Amino acid sequence: MSLGVIAAAIAIGLSALGAGIGNGLIVSRTIEGVARQPELKGALQTIMFIGVALVEALPIIGVVIAFIVMNK
């Protein structure tokens, strides 16, 4: 097994771990906000979905970097 494959696995794993933690924090804070101010549910959901989309970009970038590292 080459070092490129190991590096790719580490890149994908760490990016997925970071995204999972980030998504959990975003959703939990959104639920707390809706519990405090139910009238802002729509605005908070919109902001949450934008935040989740930005956090999910991290694993996609990690996969791209992993493919680049594997092919070198």
Swiss-Prot record:
Gene3D superfamilies: F1F0 ATP synthase subunit C. It is a multi-pass membrane protein. It is found in: Cell membrane. The chain crosses the membrane at residues 1-21, 49-69. Keywords: ATP synthesis, Cell membrane, CF(0), Hydrogen ion transport, Ion transport, Lipid-binding, Membrane, Transmembrane, Transmembrane helix, Transport. SUPFAM superfamilies: F1F0 ATP synthase subunit C. Disulfide bonds: none annotated. Its main location: membrane. It comes from the Bacteria. The record marks E56 as: Reversibly protonated during proton transport. GO terms for biological process: proton motive force-driven ATP synthesis. One of its GO terms (molecular function) is lipid binding. GO terms for cellular component: plasma membrane; proton-transporting ATP synthase complex; proton-transporting two-sector ATPase complex, proton-transporting domain. F-type ATPases have 2 components, F(1) - the catalytic core - and F(0) - the membrane proton channel. F(1) has five subunits: alpha(3), beta(3), gamma(1), delta(1), epsilon(1). F(0) has three main subunits: a(1), b(2) and c(10-14). The alpha and beta chains form an alternating ring which encloses part of the gamma chain. F(1) is attached to F(0) by a central stalk formed by the gamma and epsilon chains, while a peripheral stalk is formed by the delta and b chains. Belongs to the ATPase C chain family. F(1)F(0) ATP synthase produces ATP from ADP in the presence of a proton or sodium gradient. F-type ATPases consist of two structural domains, F(1) containing the extramembraneous catalytic core and F(0) containing the membrane proton channel, linked together by a central stalk and a peripheral stalk. During catalysis, ATP synthesis in the catalytic domain of F(1) is coupled via a rotary mechanism of the central stalk subunits to proton translocation. This is ATP synthase subunit c. It comes from Bacillus cereus (strain ATCC 14579 / DSM 31 / CCUG 7414 / JCM 2152 / NBRC 15305 / NCIMB 9373 / NCTC 2599 / NRRL B-3711). The gene is atpE.
